[in-house]
């Protein structure tokens, strides 16, 4: 076993241990959070038109991408090593290029699952709010997933591990080897982190836990991004764009359900006032 293989093996074990410790620690923090429920504010509400548009958009993006991926040949999946040379990769992406590591791949998938499960903390809210929060989260995931899937379909980029001799041949057979941009795990992780942070800070503006929730959510999302690079699945620019897409959707969808957003479309009340003066009759109409 070479020095680099030993280093990768050691890193994999340590990251796996860290993943377990974070999971246990998160459980303890969640218990404390549930024990001290802060004052709740109701900033979000559903709207038939608004949610019809967002659910429809998310379903259309994700559904059409799935259909095109399975039944329409968008990409040429024939692999030619001569087409993919490390020297053609931008310098800042070369720095983080790594061969494939299955252990780190698995740990990265685990951190993604943890971030996506983070909104479970909103069980501390009144049950009457669960439908609103749940609907917003479904919209967030559908839109974020649809955007990253369509980008993957339209952008032809080999994954970093394909530039190394020991690339996984099963990935080549699956046709996933040229879907590097953007990082799907990172997109969904940051969407979950941004959603959790936005909703918690809006619903519990005076809570001392909001910084911890934001830090833990984005910290786990960032760990996912690092693991996706370390496992050889993505370049730096893949995870960067994925983080931007996920964060944008994660913040935008909850905002589009706030009273602040709805107030911009409320019509001002129309009132009329009539009065009789020595000079005659006057009528004032406010709109």
Model-derived regions, located:
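Membrane-helix interface linkers and caps
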Residues: 75-77, 127-130
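Hydrophobic alpha-helical transmembrane segments of multi-pass membrane proteins
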Residues: 103-107, 134, 138, 183
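N-terminal transmembrane-helix/juxtamembrane module of multi-pass inner/ER membrane proteins
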Residues: 32-116, 154-169
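Conserved, well-structured interaction surfaces
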Residues: 120-126
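Acidic/His-rich structured neighborhood in mature extracellular/periplasmic domains
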Residues: 110-114, 120, 132-141, 146
